């Protein structure tokens, strides 16, 4: 889930190759799978030490005043939040992002889409309790929810092929 290499699958299926062939410099960051050691990291840390730092490094490296920023999935939610922050933090003529694009990004969190079937008070409570104990959301827990959304191909197919 949410892996950077979706933009660089093969030489013939690579947005990275396409963009570099067009003369763009491409920088990709990816989430580190969290563990207990990262339980103190908060969302604003991802904004300031993640996105804002990446934008700063990219503008310096390329010697340009602005970059184009792309967010994928939850990274797009982070980019959306970053852009709201940046528009308040930077003067309009000093904004380091010229354009931004989102792929498969949920921006209206009041309508979460198909995953809504798993969201109720009890499931949120259980998730919050688990995260309070561990200090982070284990990727396997998130992956389980996504597998259930595609149960025919990601769950039952395994059972049919291996046990029936």
Residue ranges: model-predicted function:
Residues 1-2, 31-34, 53, 74-75, ...:
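Short, glycine-/Ser/Thr-/acidic-enriched flexible segments
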Residues 71-75, 79:
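Gly/Ala-rich beta-loop-alpha elbow adjacent to hydrolase catalytic centers
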Residues 1, 18, 23-27, 57, ...:
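Beta-sheet entry/capping signal
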Residues 6-10, 38-46, 69-70:
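Alpha-helix capping and helix-loop boundary segments enriched in small/acidic/polar residues
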Residues 1-36:
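Short, surface-exposed "cap/lid" segments of acyl-processing enzymes
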Residues 40-61:
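Alpha/beta-hydrolase active-site loop
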Residues 56, 60, 64, 78, ...:
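Alpha/beta-hydrolase-fold enzymes
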């Amino acid at each position: 889930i949410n892996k950077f290499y979706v933009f660089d699958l093969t030489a013939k299926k690579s947005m990275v190759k396409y963009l570099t062939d067009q003369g763009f410099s491409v920088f990709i960051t990816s989430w580190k799978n969290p563990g207990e050691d990262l339980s103190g990291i908060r969302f604003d840390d991802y904004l300031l030490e993640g996105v804002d730092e990446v934008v700063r490094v990219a503008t310096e490296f390329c010697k340009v005043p602005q970059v184009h920023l792309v967010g994928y999935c939850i990274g797009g939610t982070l980019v959306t939040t970053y852009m709201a922050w940046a528009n308040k933090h930077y003067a309009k003529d000093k904004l380091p992002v010229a354009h931004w694009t989102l792929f498969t990004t949920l921006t209206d969190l009041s309508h979460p889409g198909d995953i809504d079937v798993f969201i109720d008070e009890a499931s949120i409570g259980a998730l919050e309790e688990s995260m309070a104990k561990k200090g982070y959301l284990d990727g396997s827990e998130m992956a389980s929810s996504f597998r259930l959304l595609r149960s025919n191909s990601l769950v039952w197919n395994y059972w049919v092929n291996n046990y029936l």
